[in-house]
Amino acid sequence: MAWAAEYRGRVHLVGGYAEQQVDKPYHHAYDPGSDRWEELPQLPRGANHVGVAALGNRLYAFGGFTEQNRNPHDGVFAFEGERWHTLRRLPEACGAIACVALGDEIHLIGGAIGTDNRRSIDWHLVYNPAEDRYGRRQPMPLGRDHTGVVAVNGVVHLIAGRVDSFHTNSNLHHTYNPNTDEWTARAPIPTARSGHGTVWYRDRIFVMGGEGTNRVYGQTEAYDPVRNTWESYAPMLTPRHGMGAVTVGDAIYVAGGGPQMGGGVKSAINEAFSLA
């Protein structure tokens, strides 16, 4: 199980659970054109629930957990060309951060800190790659981790996620406007969930998968930002959580993840969704 981002026309999966370990430094890229995977230089520090985002010519990796969904680290790295570079550390060790590029910055929202006292946080940072510095912005309305995030038309959409545990999932949906430093409530997602995929595709925000109490979700729901409404689409062929979901070209690619609750069972499945 690993999170992903689109970088240079490919799906890049970073870190995750694999081979009976929870802190793999793996870095794989999938090319939809050739339907092939490539193993790339590994992360300097392995972890799960690594926050990933692409901006400009670099792929960024923020934090992550060194144990199963706990014990985070504060390392930050950027991949460019054929190697990883070490960047300024996070202000505090954190995992399961929602990361998205907007303009010349990367927004880092929510996540979880701690080990024995693991808890969700409401922080909202922006990372400036040109200066290698962090700034603080208005915190998210409710501290969560495992949320979905996407930037559309100059604002950030933050969708669902968990408060400390998947037993307390949220259906909240807010937008953040960087010009006013304010959050605004939007139509809540019909299915409260966490560990889901969230992407922008054909003028809508598509959300798929995720987990909750005693179940893994296969529902696919899409949000229309113009009408502020949600609608349902075809469910996933293989319901999963903790997968990498990325739009490349005219399709959504959903790779890896867990077909059962928790991290005990992993999947290597890669499936695509597209509209006619």
Where are these regions (language model features)?
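Kelch-like beta-propeller repeat domains
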Residues: M1-A276
